[in-house]
């Protein structure tokens, strides 16, 4: 009997893994239906009230049964609260309210929504790439390219909508991460110029310059990316290729860039960064450093590592030892790791 119970528990654990995709897809449905905003930060709403808001915004009827099943799952994983109440006629009903998770998916001025990141990761082009992970193991091929006929960056350059979704996701991630970076690192005050390599729309370097107005900020990225970047006070948008040359500055800043590439490409980026800074300059890297201790932070890092494996050319999340080896090969003498919340770290690298 004990072995049967153990076997069935194992089956249950496997099925939880098998069906995990239902969670982000239900979350996406809620975001596209604007439910985090409908519920907001304080409201406790019945299914009928939520449905009424959706119907008003879409001008279409809502199938409440289907909606309730989505909400039931999301409440079970902590995205919304679920409370048994009675209406003014004494009839039992469920009411749904906000949590810290749902607030992070709503649009508000206080913080950047995480919804764009969800929509980016849930795209068909990303899901299809995972179908080829086994080929990556056998022949070293790039899963995203096999699935979509070109790598992610080429795809974005040829598809404006995909490029928009990607840039919105990167901007969303930047807002929360940069707040932690600025709180943890005071070294920016000693720099007169900072170049953000792979800076996208320029949100990270704009955040730095807003906090330290004396800094001349350079947002450096590929031409098709820089073309969509809005003008920003104190920031110069420069197009180019980080594998060829990086603009000179007192500090080179890179947020979630090295994890896109294999060691060979990372060495080119780091060596070009070395050439771009003076002897007392710094390289500032914001990236995941895979945690040694078991827990959510390590698991998220490992899942992100698999995302890099599927989505990028040799992309990977790295351990501290792997970063140390790259820095040594690129000619740098020392580095220090500054812990910040989430699963990222800030790495300061010196000549």
Which residue stretches match the model-derived regions?
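Hydrophobic beta-strand segment of the Class I
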Residues: 252-253, 257
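Class I SAM-dependent methyltransferase SAM/SAH-binding core
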Residues: 193-245, 251, 268
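A short glycine-rich, Lys/Arg-flanked "PGG" loop and its adjoining helix->strand segment in the class I
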Residues: 267-279
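Short beta-strand "wing" residues that participate in macromolecule-binding interfaces
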Residues: 81-82, 98, 285, 334-337
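C-terminal alpha-helical "lid/dimerization" subdomain adjacent to the S-adenosyl-L-methionine
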Residues: 286-330, 335-336
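Core SAM-dependent methyltransferase catalytic element
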Residues: 331-351
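Short glycine-centered segments of the SAM/dcSAM-binding site in methyltransferase folds
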Residues: 280-284
């Amino acid at each position: 009997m004990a072995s049967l119970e153990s076997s069935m528990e194992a089956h249950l654990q496997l099925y939880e893994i098998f069906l995990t995709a239902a969670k982000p897809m239900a979350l996406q449905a809620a975001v596209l239906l604007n439910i985090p905003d409908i519920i907001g930060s304080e409201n406790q709403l019945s299914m009928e009230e939520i449905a009424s808001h959706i119907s008003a915004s879409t001008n279409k009827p809502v199938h409440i049964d289907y909606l309730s099943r989505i909400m039931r799952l999301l409440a079970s994983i902590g995205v919304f609260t679920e409370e048994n109440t009675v209406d003014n006629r004494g009839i039992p009903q469920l009411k749904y309210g906000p949590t810290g998770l749902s607030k992070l998916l709503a649009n508000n001025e206080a913080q950047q929504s995480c919804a764009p990141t969800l929509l980016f990761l849930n795209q068909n082009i990303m899901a299809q790439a995972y179908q080829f992970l086994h080929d990556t193991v056998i022949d070293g091929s790039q899963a995203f390219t096999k699935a979509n006929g070109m790598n992610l960056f080429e795809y974005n350059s040829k598809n404006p909508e995909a490029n928009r979704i990607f840039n919105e996701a990167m901007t969303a991630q930047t807002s929360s991460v940069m707040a932690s970076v600025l709180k943890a690192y005071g070294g920016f005050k000693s720099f007169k110029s900072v170049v953000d390599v792979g800076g996208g729309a320029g949100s990270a370097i704009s955040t730095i310059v807003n906090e330290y107005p004396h800094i001349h900020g350079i947002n450096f990225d590929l031409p098709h990316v820089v073309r969509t970047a809005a003008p920003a006070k104190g920031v110069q948008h420069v197009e180019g290729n980080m594998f060829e040359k990086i603009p000179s500055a007192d500090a080179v800043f890179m947020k979630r860039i090295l994890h896109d590439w294999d060691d060979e490409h990372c060495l080119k980026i780091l060596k070009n960064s070395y050439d771009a800074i003076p002897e007392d300059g710094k390289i500032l890297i914001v990236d995941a450093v895979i945690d040694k201790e078991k827990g959510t932070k390590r698991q998220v890092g490992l899942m992100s590592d698999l995302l890099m494996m599927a989505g990028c050319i040799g992309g990977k999340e790295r351990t501290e030892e792997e970063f140390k080896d790259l820095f040594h090969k690129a000619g740098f003498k020392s580095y220090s790791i500054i812990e910040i919340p989430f699963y990222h770290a800030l790495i300061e690298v010196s000549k």
